Amino acid sequence: MPGCMMKTIKEAVVVGGGPVGSTTAFHLSQLGVATTVFEEHDEIGVPSHCAGHLSIRSLRSLGLYPLPNGIVENVFSAANFHSPASTTFSIRLKRPVTCTVNRELFDKLLAERARAAGAEYRLGSRVSSLLMDNGFVKGVNAEHDSGVESVASRVTVDAEGISSRLLREAGLPRLNGARLVHAVEAEVENVANVQMDAVEVFIGKDYAPGFYAWVIPRRDGSAKVGLAAKSGNPKEFLQRLMFKHPVASRMLGNSRIVKIAFHSVTLGGPIPRTYANGFLAVGDVASQVKPTTGGGIIFGLTCARVAAETAAAAIRAGDVSAFFLGQYQRRCREALGFDFSVMLRARRFLDSLSDEKIDKAFRICNRLGLGKALEDVEEIDFQGRLLLQMLTKPASATALAYFLLLYLSANP
């Protein structure tokens, strides 16, 4: 029977070998911090739980674009939004603004970058609990084939994704279960009638109640298809989208699912506190996810660098108290707080609209020529800043005023 192994000591431990965990480990290692990453799966990037639809501008600002050959699956300069009654509102931009990446290869790239900087990886090692001492997180207990290993660390960074296990032990707020949606993502072959440079978005309670569905074509003729919903069975909604939706069925009616995955997405904005004595939470586990689209990679990578810089400074100062580590949350709020505030309001607005009001909003957008007004948009992640940019355009300002009236009428 596997036994308990002796305690080993590290300066920093990162829980989770996804993009956020690997980026945290990369920056920690670059700053001279001896770092070990614990990943419960035997292989980085497997299984994949995300479409990998990312902003080119944001990737470039993070030093990750252009990406090596084979990782980018497609680039996009257009989007078609389909209302519940199949009114289509289209945006065609002047240049490609987003790309999709092969998540397995993307995750492996970030892990190899961290390894090259000096980080150690323990694959097939599941962190089961924290080592606690007098209110301080002092490391982790990790389970693997040969037993349970206790690893002491000055700072532990939780980047394990959607989970509240370690948050509870560290005394931090849990993820808000009321703000979760449940997603299904599939890779499909034999797709037809798609624009290769356009993402398709489908809205309506019959197909994705409380969120939306998407079709993202790949250059090889396949596509990534998915949706999320607040209630109901995501797999049943996916079948309905593929074979019953008047627009999507023309794209997917003869397609075949070759891979499928299920996961949850948090839309409630960052948890109230992301730090404790000897402990930081970053990425999905801290709900650093866009409330509008559910995308978490770019904001997670942004916060990962801040987490690493804060942890390294704390270790150098010999002070890993919550008071010192609290600067991590303050810096993240300075960088992203305005955008989160705008997106949370936008999410409440979207949730308040009936299908009928969404259809009317689409017609108004087309009538005002909003698609033309947005053709030079490049910023899609930092949506508070996008809002300020939109307000300089007459058509956008008029549409936003209309949406505000819709919101007020839905929230007396």
Regions picked out by a protein language model, each given a short descriptive name:
Residues 55-109:
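A conserved beta-strand/loop capping segment in the N-terminal third of enzymes
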Residues 127-129, 233-310, 316, 322-326:
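FAD/FMN-dependent oxidoreductases across multiple families
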Residues 113-253, 287:
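Predominantly flavin-linked oxidoreductase catalytic cores and closely associated redox partners
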Residues 7-20:
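Beta1/beta-strand and adjacent pyrophosphate-binding region of the FAD-binding site
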Residues 20, 43, 163:
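Conserved Rossmann-like nucleotide-cofactor binding loop
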Residues 26-49:
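Glycine-rich FAD pyrophosphate-binding loop
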Residues 312-412:
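C-terminal helical "tail/cap" subdomain of flavin- and related membrane-associated enzymes
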Residues 12, 33-35, 156:
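Hydrophobic anchor at the start of a short beta-strand
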